[in-house]
């Protein structure tokens, strides 16, 4: 029924996806995933877990990855607005250490595909945001890893959210990007 527009970012494999939205005075309808179209666009993945979070303005989640149960993610916002970021942690990649970001909102309905081998995070720009994502592997607390959101090597340019960033105590403990080897991402 619906068609998707797939736009490759400057980092190969990281894709912004725009669904076709059918709207009228009653509201709207859109497909948020259609395996055949995603496969045709090069995203031939099996998603095994769906997650949802709710956060308030200034919450900065990330930058997260899993070392062993490496996850690809298809993310979108169902309420509010976030700035979403993917950081290439694949040591054999030409874009190793580079990042790309996109604004996702309930208004623009964009989705963001982040492949395995990337760190991922987002900053909430609205009063409240609800964030949904599909993962290619299950959550494994023993595989948790991350990069500081303000790492000087990666140097993500987070937009102004109108308040101080709110991060978890755990996210403040991540080793700097330059101190990590990322050997678990060599196959990606």
Model features per residue range: what roles?
Residues 85, 112, 120-125, 133:
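Short beta-strand His + acidic residue motifs that chelate non-heme Fe in jelly-roll/DSBH
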């Amino acid at each position: 029924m619906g068609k998707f527009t797939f736009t490759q970012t400057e980092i190969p494999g990281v894709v912004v996806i725009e669904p076709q939205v059918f709207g009228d005075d009653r509201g709207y309808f859109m497909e948020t995933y259609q395996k055949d179209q995603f496969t045709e666009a090069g995203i031939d993945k099996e998603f095994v877990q769906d997650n949802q979070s709710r956060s308030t303005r200034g919450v900065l989640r990330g930058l997260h990855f899993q070392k062993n149960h490496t996850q690809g993610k298809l993310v979108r916002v169902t309420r509010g607005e976030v700035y979403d970021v993917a950081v290439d942690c694949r040591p054999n990649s030409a874009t190793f250490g580079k990042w790309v970001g996109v604004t996702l909102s309930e208004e623009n309905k964009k989705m963001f595909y982040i492949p395995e081998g990337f760190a991922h995070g987002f900053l909430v720009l609205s009063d409240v945001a609800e964030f949904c994502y599909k993962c290619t592997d299950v959550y494994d607390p023993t595989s948790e890893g991350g990069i500081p959101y303000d790492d000087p090597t990666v140097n993500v340019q987070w937009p102004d959210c109108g308040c101080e960033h709110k991060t978890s105590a755990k996210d403040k403990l991540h080793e700097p990007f330059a101190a990590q080897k990322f050997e678990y991402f060599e196959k990606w």
